[in-house]
């Protein structure tokens, strides 16, 4: 039964078999001849390796390449040197093998022989002309990698005999690349050839080997920073892989793509050396910031005006250079640039002012010889571009001295990628403006400024959309390392310690710029008012033709320009106003007057400020209703009292004035930096050196006074001020009585006071306006006294930056009486212990820092003041003195302006000094016994402080002793643990030595096995090659 079932299954299998693919196969198996065909080069290398010279000769006769290299770049000669096969080395060299052919790592056969220590092969190779100065990829010569002394001696002797400069040999490749890069840059054509195997470019090589100079030149010549080799590696991959930090930084600064992947999906971070991974991450953050900053920047890098005619021509940089323009704009601009060159060279002869040029980083090594070769160069203008197009940045590039043309040689253009800006320009755009912007500040005369026209101003306002900076104003911009913050701080601190006058047009523009950035609503109005102001100036062209000062928009760009532009100027002489207005505009007038060429008149310069001065004056007039408007011939530094009939200016409405005053006050509150002790000492020393014997008020006093005045004025009403004026008169009478008593009782105290307070009292009584009872004519007459006394004093050259800051704080001379009342009231309240806490807190730090002596009121000062007032009513004599001073203005414009500025600042802030006096000054209203009490208090405080100091010293010594004990304990523990560590290490090393000795015994057996396997391998290869024929 089972047999039947088996047969049935078998039959079914046979049925399924019939017609299957296997059944359809032919019965005779096809015999295909299988051949293993090796590359001729591989066969040749195998034959050489086996030492079969006959086989090698046959292969050479059949056309084999004797210099064939395997995947690692090793040739038969390399292999023979490694195998110590002297016969094969001689055979190959005799048959024409290249004795200096490098492998993939740059090793020539001599490197291999030196590394292995085969003296006979090395001697033979040197005898046949091998290069002992050959350098591999890591910069090593055969001498560097030789390990045996005999080999080192052989190679050293040969180096000495041939006179090879090893250091020069190491830098040979970089020198050649540098030469080629310069050549490409000068010719405007990059003729680079990719590596045959890897597809690497010169940029890859420079990045991988850290040739930073070559890298910069290649990028400048227009190389794509994201170019890839055959494996998809960019230059950043190469630089990161070989750990070249500087090369990575240059590539990132030129906005290379840090996320690019190679053929196997690796970014530069994946292939980077571990040591620079953190640095790469920092660079990535930096590049992200650069990208975001670039997106935010809508304005051009160099903001040019309508046709650059109202500015000096841009000068050449210090190196031999060419101008690189954005490629997509080249065609449309080259002609215009050529035309402009001739015009601006002529203009450059008239205008001797020059731009201080910034040297590019990459040109530092070559720039020393060319520092004196700055000549006019083509400047890029906005006039030939649409309003939405950014003016191109001028990018500099060094040239070889052998290929040097004139600096105004035709502009080269480079074939770069279609729509990209050249990478160097990208780098320049993203650099912080603080460094290169310095090159845009004017440092000399400004004669060329007079050539501007109203139509060009209109075009300029259109192009810059109301926020326009002239080339002479610094630009404060946020950068990666907080340069804005440093700049702002620097601009503020200049007021304290600046020793010299900065040579630039608007010295206060740094501070003004900071304020302007905070008020965007004022910017748009400034562009309109400035254009209108320029049109008004054109009407006065008979005066202004000589040297009109066109104020940059960053200087004084405030709402009060609205007033100045709405007042038509019809005077033939510049008009000045109240002290506040004059003080406000002095920085511009003094800086321009100082820089006017000797032959030109300063009248036009000063008249350009008259509108702003009148605006300030009208502000003060509306506030005080006192006739303080006066005239000044030629210079805005001397005030002619009580002569409003000679002015021809019209005032603006009171509504606009008050609105402007409120707006200005809101953002002019001074911010004081915290000072260290050393800074304070330096500032005090500078102040002492630069002031006269009668100058008692420093810049710090002015700043503190303005703070207090601003706060008190905002909180007090008119009614309170009137009450305080009455109180002030009563207090004066009381004080005079007290002082008379004190004079008889305490003569020694009076002498002390007179000795230390004269510097303050003389200045104050000489320049202070009279009290409110005679606030109209006498106030003007005291101003004339100020003007006449001003020029008799010695010259005081304060820096313009100090003047600019002082001007903002001393605007309230016309309301001196009100402020006196306020200060007296505050003193009284302070003595009753009812004054606000904030005022007391403000006093304390000031008292600690006072270094200019003690200020007192005396009976003599008040009597002198009355005598002064009676003297100043004689107007004719003072006016004579004034005209005398005016004639002197031409020769001392800068110093007199500064002097007037400082005197106004002191008189305006004197009342604040009353509030700031130390205890001894305020106690003179009390009995003389208070001095004894004060002395006892100070004595007790000193004793207390001494006791505290003693306790602190004791604690300090205890702590030092504890620290020494702890240190010694730690040292003992460290020594013990170190001994144990050394013992463990020694045991481990001994075990290791014994293991090595065992392995050393097995070494001969391994060598024998290795040789046998080599022989078998060679035999197999020969058999296979014969079979394949």
UniProtKB/Swiss-Prot annotation:
The modification Phosphothreonine is found at residues 443, 694. Residues 681-691, 840-851 have a biased composition (Basic residues). Signal peptide: none annotated. Residues 385-402, 469-480, 564-578, 596-610, 626-656, 771-786, 883-897 have a biased composition (Low complexity). It comes from the Eukaryota. Residues 291-300, 318-353, 422-432, 481-491, 614-625, 671-680, 716-765, 813-839, 866-882, 913-927 have a biased composition (Basic and acidic residues). This is Protein phosphatase 1 regulatory subunit 12A. It comes from Mus musculus. The lineage of its organism: Eukaryota, Metazoa, Chordata, Craniata, Vertebrata. The gene is Ppp1r12a.
């Amino acid at each position: 039964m089972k047999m039947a079932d088996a047969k049935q299954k078998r039959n079914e299998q046979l049925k399924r078999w019939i017609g299957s693919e296997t059944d359809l196969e032919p019965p005779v198996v096809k015999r295909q001849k299988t051949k293993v065909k090796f590359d001729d080069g591989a066969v040749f290398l195998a034959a050489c390796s086996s030492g079969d010279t006959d086989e090698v000769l046959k292969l050479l006769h059949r056309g084999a390449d004797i210099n064939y290299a395997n995947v690692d770049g090793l040739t038969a000669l390399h292999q023979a040197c490694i195998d110590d096969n002297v016969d094969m080395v001689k055979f190959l060299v005799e048959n024409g093998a290249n004795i200096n052919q490098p492998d993939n790592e740059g090793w020539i056969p001599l490197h291999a022989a030196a590394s292995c220590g085969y003296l006979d092969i090395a001697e033979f190779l040197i005898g046949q002309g091998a290069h002992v100065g050959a350098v591999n990829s890591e910069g090593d010569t055969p001498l560097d990698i030789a390990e045996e002394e005999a080999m080192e001696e052989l190679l050293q002797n040969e180096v000495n005999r041939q006179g090879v400069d090893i250091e020069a040999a190491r830098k040979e490749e970089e020198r050649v690349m540098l030469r080629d890069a310069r050549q490409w840059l000068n010719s405007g054509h990059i003729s680079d050839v990719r590596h045959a195997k890897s597809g690497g470019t010169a940029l890859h090589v420079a990045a991988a080997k850290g040739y930073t100079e070559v890298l910069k030149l290649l990028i400048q010549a227009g190389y794509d920073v994201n170019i890839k080799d055959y494996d998809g590696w960019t230059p950043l991959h190469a630089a990161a892989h070989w750990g070249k930090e500087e090369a990575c930084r240059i590539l990132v600064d030129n906005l290379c793509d840090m996320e690019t992947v190679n053929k196997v999906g690796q970014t530069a971070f994946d292939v980077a050396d571990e040591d620079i991974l953190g640095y790469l991450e920092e660079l990535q953050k930096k590049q992200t910031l650069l990208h975001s900053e670039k997106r935010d920047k809508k304005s051009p890098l160099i903001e040019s005006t309508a046709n650059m005619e109202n500015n000096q021509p841009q000068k050449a940089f210090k190196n031999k250079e060419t101008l690189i323009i954005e490629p997509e704009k080249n065609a449309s601009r080259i002609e215009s640039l050529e035309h402009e060159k001739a015009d601006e060279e002529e203009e450059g002869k008239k205008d001797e002012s020059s731009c201080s040029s910034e040297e590019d980083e990459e040109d530092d090594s070559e720039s020393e010889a060319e520092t004196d070769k700055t000549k006019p160069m083509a400047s890029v203008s906005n006039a030939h571009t649409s309003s939405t197009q950014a003016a191109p940045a001028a990018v500099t590039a060094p040239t070889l001295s052998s290929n040097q043309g004139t600096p105004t040689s035709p502009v080269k253009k480079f074939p770069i990628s279609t729509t990209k800006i050249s990478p160097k320009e990208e780098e320049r755009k993203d650099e912080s403006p603080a460094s290169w912007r310095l090159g845009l500040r004017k440092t000399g005369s400004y004669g060329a400024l007079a050539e501007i026209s109203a139509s060009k101003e209109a075009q300029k306002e259109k192009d810059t959309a109301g926020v326009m900076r002239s080339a002479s104003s610094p630009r404060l911009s946020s950068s990666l390392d907080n340069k804005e913050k440093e700049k702002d701080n620097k601009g503020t601190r200049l007021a304290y310690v600046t020793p010299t006058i900065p040579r630039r047009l608007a010295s206060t523009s740094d501070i003004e710029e900071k304020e302007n950035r905070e008020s965007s609503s004022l910017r748009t109005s400034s562009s309109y008012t400035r254009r209108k102001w320029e049109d008004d100036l054109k009407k006065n062209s008979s005066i202004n033709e000589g040297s009109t000062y066109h104020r940059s928009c960053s200087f004084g760009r405030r709402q009060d320009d609205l007033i100045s532009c709405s007042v038509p100027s019809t005077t033939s002489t510049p008009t000045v106003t109240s002290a506040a207005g004059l003080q406000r505009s002095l920085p511009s007038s003094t800086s321009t007057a100082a820089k006017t060429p000797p032959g030109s008149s300063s009248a036009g310069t000063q008249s350009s400020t008259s509108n702003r001065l009148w605006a300030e004056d009208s502000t003060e007039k509306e506030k005080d209703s006192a006739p303080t408007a006066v005239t000044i011939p030629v210079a805005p530094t001397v005030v002619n009292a009580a002569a409003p009939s000679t002015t021809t200016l019209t005032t603006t409405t009171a509504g606009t004035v008050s609105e402007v005053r409120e707006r200005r006050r809101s953002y002019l509150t001074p911010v004081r930096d915290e000072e260290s002790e050393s800074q304070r000492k330096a500032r005090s020393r500078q102040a002492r050196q630069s002031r006269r014997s009668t100058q008692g008020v420093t810049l710090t006093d002015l700043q503190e006074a303005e703070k207090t005045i601003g706060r008190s004025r905002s909180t007090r009403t008119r009614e309170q001020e009137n009450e305080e004026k009455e109180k002030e008169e009563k207090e004066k009478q009381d004080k005079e009585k007290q002082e008379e008593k004190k004079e008889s009782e305490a003569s020694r105290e009076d002498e002390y006071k007179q000795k230390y307070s004269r510097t303050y009292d003389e200045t104050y009584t000489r320049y202070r306006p009279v009290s409110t009872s005679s606030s109209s004519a006498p106030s003007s007459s005291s101003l004339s006294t100020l003007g006449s006394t001003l020029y008799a004093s010695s010259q005081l050259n304060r820096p313009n930056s100090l003047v600019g800051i002082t001007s903002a704080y001393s605007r309230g001379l016309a309301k001196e009486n009100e402020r006196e009342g306020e200060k007296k009231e505050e003193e009284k309240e302070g003595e009753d212990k009812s004054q606000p806490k904030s005022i007391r807190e403000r006093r304390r730090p000031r008292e600690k820092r006072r270094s200019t002596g003690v200020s007192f009121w005396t009976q003599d000062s008040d009597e002198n003041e009355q005598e002064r007032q009676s003297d100043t009513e004689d107007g004719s004599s003072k006016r004579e003195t004034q005209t005398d001073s005016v004639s002197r203005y031409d020769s001392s414009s800068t110093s007199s302006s500064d002097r007037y500025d400082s005197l106004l600042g002191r008189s305006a802030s004197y009342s604040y000094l009353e509030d700031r006096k130390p205890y001894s000054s305020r106690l003179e209203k009390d009995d003389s016994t208070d001095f004894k009490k004060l002395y006892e208090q100070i004595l007790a405080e000193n004793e207390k402080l001494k006791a505290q100091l003693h306790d602190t010293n004791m604690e300090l010594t205890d702590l030092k002793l504890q620290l020494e004990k702890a240190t010694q304990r730690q040292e003992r523990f460290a020594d013990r643990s170190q001994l144990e560590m050394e013992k463990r290490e020694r045991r481990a090393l001994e075990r290791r030595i014994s293991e090595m000795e065992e392995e050393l015994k097995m070494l001969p057996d391994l060598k024998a096995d290795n040789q046998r396997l080599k022989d078998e391998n060679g035999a197999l290869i020969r058999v296979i090659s014969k079979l394949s024929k």
